[in-house]
Amino acid sequence: MSNFAIILAAGKGTRMKSDLPKVLHKVAGISMLEHVFRSVGAIQPEKTVTVVGHKAELVEEVLAGQTEFVTQSEQLGTGHAVMMTEPILEGLSGHTLVIAGDTPLITGESLKNLIDFHINHKNVATILTAETDNPFGYGRIVRNDNAEVLRIVEQKDATDFEKQIKEINTGTYVFDNERLFEALKNINTNNAQGEYYITDVIGIFRETGEKVGAYTLKDFDESLGVNDRVALATAESVMRRRINHKHMVNGVSFVNPEATYIDIDVEIAPEVQIEANVTLKGQTKIGAETVLTNGTYVVDSTIGAGAVITNSMIEESSVADGVTVGPYAHIRPNSSLGAQVHIGNFVEVKGSSIGENTKAGHLTYIGNCEVGSNVNFGAGTITVNYDGKNKYKTVIGDNVFVGSNSTIIAPVELGDNSLVGAGSTITKDVPADAIAIGRGRQINKDEYATRLPHHPKNQ
């Protein structure tokens, strides 16, 4: 039989105090909805239907082409949300997972175990439950002496005895698809909230003598639903611990994993060393034996093997094997650094390609440049790429030596093996093998300093 999935993502999330739909708030680099969608993929659903509502167009954009969408125009409860999927799923034979889009910590393994449990026990409905020492606020799972599920009782309706139950409802379910939609026709809004509750179908199944079961999570953290910023921060913390643990198991060393922030899609090879306060975001990839020191921040970039990045920022760029960057360097988007390049302290590279073995040790700006191999930039070199309206390119060949405190005004080309004298302002192309000196001639005026106030004779 087929598996189907319904993801509930229509809520506004008032307690988040945000215009952004709740399910689009991010945990470890991707939205909560994407986390749930990826986990749902473990059951290989034939159809996945996402129920949208508040700012539906934003939610649909995130999963465009990956799921079908239905709209819940009025927020009339979880049962009502599932009813919205009827045109797509009613009458199909199979098992349907119903899950909230604000549960980013649920794993694909747990959802696979849930649906296998449901099938193996021939249940018409299976509730995903968890156990906690502090069940206050959760619906409790009431079982009979044979451990069969009798009902779900909410906190406000629970007796003193039922309040002692530690097994709680996580809000995730698997149903026989055909029976689900039959039962939904019989639920009503006769409750304090005036809403259709998906939990009411459990009572209907019990009344008709059908089998209802419960599968209990091994890890309570997976049950966390995010309703406010506090819970969002908790989810972030749990997810990052998982991510860091996975990398450590795979051979990555962390000085302080509690102070290291790695997004879920980051790839890290073995033998990488990561110091505290390192942030790796987006689609970043780190090669083997690379060292990332305290304070390094990398976004959507690829760093090769054996690199050393010291307290620097790298954005949307590629860094080859053996490169050293920093401290306090900034590699801005669309840059590429060849093998063994050295970018030192207080150097900024923007939109430039730099050939292997090139060095810019300190206090340099390289913007919109094509730089060859074995180039040396002296301290204080500036490539001037912007005239206030347009940006221009500088081309620097192989084996070029640029003296300290030089200004290279684009568009200009420095040929292979050329040399720029220190303190020069270069406005014209420099041929290969040439020396360019673009500064005023030094003039010494003997004894002139004796006329000035600073001179000891005038004190």
UniProtKB/Swiss-Prot annotation:
<feature type="binding site">
    <location>
        <position position="350"/>
    </location>
    <ligand>
        <name>UDP-N-acetyl-alpha-D-glucosamine</name>
    </ligand>
</feature>
<dbReference type="Pfam" id="PF00483">
    <property type="entry name" value="NTP_transferase"/>
</dbReference>
<dbReference type="GO" id="GO:0009245">
    <property type="term" value="P:lipid A biosynthetic process"/>
</dbReference>
<dbReference type="InterPro" id="IPR038009">
    <property type="entry name" value="GlmU_C_LbH"/>
</dbReference>
<dbReference type="InterPro" id="IPR018357">
    <property type="entry name" value="Hexapep_transf_CS"/>
</dbReference>
<feature type="binding site">
    <location>
        <position position="139"/>
    </location>
    <ligand>
        <name>UDP-N-acetyl-alpha-D-glucosamine</name>
    </ligand>
</feature>
<feature type="region of interest" description="Pyrophosphorylase">
    <location>
        <begin position="1"/>
        <end position="229"/>
    </location>
</feature>
<feature type="binding site">
    <location>
        <position position="102"/>
    </location>
    <ligand>
        <name>Mg(2+)</name>
    </ligand>
</feature>
<feature type="binding site">
    <location>
        <begin position="385"/>
        <end position="386"/>
    </location>
    <ligand>
        <name>acetyl-CoA</name>
    </ligand>
</feature>
<keyword id="KW-0573">Peptidoglycan synthesis</keyword>
<protein>
    <recommendedName>
        <fullName>Bifunctional protein GlmU</fullName>
        <ecNumber>2.7.7.23</ecNumber>
        <ecNumber>2.3.1.157</ecNumber>
    </recommendedName>
</protein>
<dbReference type="GO" id="GO:0003977">
    <property type="term" value="F:UDP-N-acetylglucosamine diphosphorylase activity"/>
</dbReference>
<dbReference type="GO" id="GO:0019134">
    <property type="term" value="F:glucosamine-1-phosphate N-acetyltransferase activity"/>
</dbReference>
<feature type="binding site">
    <location>
        <position position="404"/>
    </location>
    <ligand>
        <name>acetyl-CoA</name>
    </ligand>
</feature>
<feature type="binding site">
    <location>
        <position position="379"/>
    </location>
    <ligand>
        <name>acetyl-CoA</name>
    </ligand>
</feature>
<dbReference type="GO" id="GO:0016020">
    <property type="term" value="C:membrane"/>
</dbReference>
<feature type="active site" description="Proton acceptor">
    <location>
        <position position="362"/>
    </location>
</feature>
<dbReference type="GO" id="GO:0000902">
    <property type="term" value="P:cell morphogenesis"/>
</dbReference>
<comment type="pathway">
    <text>Nucleotide-sugar biosynthesis; UDP-N-acetyl-alpha-D-glucosamine biosynthesis; UDP-N-acetyl-alpha-D-glucosamine from N-acetyl-alpha-D-glucosamine 1-phosphate: step 1/1.</text>
</comment>
<dbReference type="Pfam" id="PF14602">
    <property type="entry name" value="Hexapep_2"/>
</dbReference>
<feature type="binding site">
    <location>
        <position position="439"/>
    </location>
    <ligand>
        <name>acetyl-CoA</name>
    </ligand>
</feature>
<keyword id="KW-0963">Cytoplasm</keyword>
<feature type="binding site">
    <location>
        <position position="22"/>
    </location>
    <ligand>
        <name>UDP-N-acetyl-alpha-D-glucosamine</name>
    </ligand>
</feature>
<feature type="binding site">
    <location>
        <position position="376"/>
    </location>
    <ligand>
        <name>UDP-N-acetyl-alpha-D-glucosamine</name>
    </ligand>
</feature>
<dbReference type="InterPro" id="IPR005835">
    <property type="entry name" value="NTP_transferase_dom"/>
</dbReference>
<dbReference type="GO" id="GO:0071555">
    <property type="term" value="P:cell wall organization"/>
</dbReference>
<keyword id="KW-0511">Multifunctional enzyme</keyword>
<feature type="binding site">
    <location>
        <begin position="77"/>
        <end position="78"/>
    </location>
    <ligand>
        <name>UDP-N-acetyl-alpha-D-glucosamine</name>
    </ligand>
</feature>
<dbReference type="InterPro" id="IPR005882">
    <property type="entry name" value="Bifunctional_GlmU"/>
</dbReference>
<keyword id="KW-0012">Acyltransferase</keyword>
<keyword id="KW-0808">Transferase</keyword>
<feature type="region of interest" description="Linker">
    <location>
        <begin position="230"/>
        <end position="250"/>
    </location>
</feature>
<dbReference type="InterPro" id="IPR011004">
    <property type="entry name" value="Trimer_LpxA-like_sf"/>
</dbReference>
<feature type="binding site">
    <location>
        <position position="422"/>
    </location>
    <ligand>
        <name>acetyl-CoA</name>
    </ligand>
</feature>
<dbReference type="InterPro" id="IPR029044">
    <property type="entry name" value="Nucleotide-diphossugar_trans"/>
</dbReference>
<dbReference type="InterPro" id="IPR001451">
    <property type="entry name" value="Hexapep"/>
</dbReference>
<keyword id="KW-0548">Nucleotidyltransferase</keyword>
<keyword id="KW-0677">Repeat</keyword>
<keyword id="KW-0479">Metal-binding</keyword>
<feature type="binding site">
    <location>
        <begin position="8"/>
        <end position="11"/>
    </location>
    <ligand>
        <name>UDP-N-acetyl-alpha-D-glucosamine</name>
    </ligand>
</feature>
<dbReference type="GO" id="GO:0009252">
    <property type="term" value="P:peptidoglycan biosynthetic process"/>
</dbReference>
<feature type="region of interest" description="N-acetyltransferase">
    <location>
        <begin position="251"/>
        <end position="459"/>
    </location>
</feature>
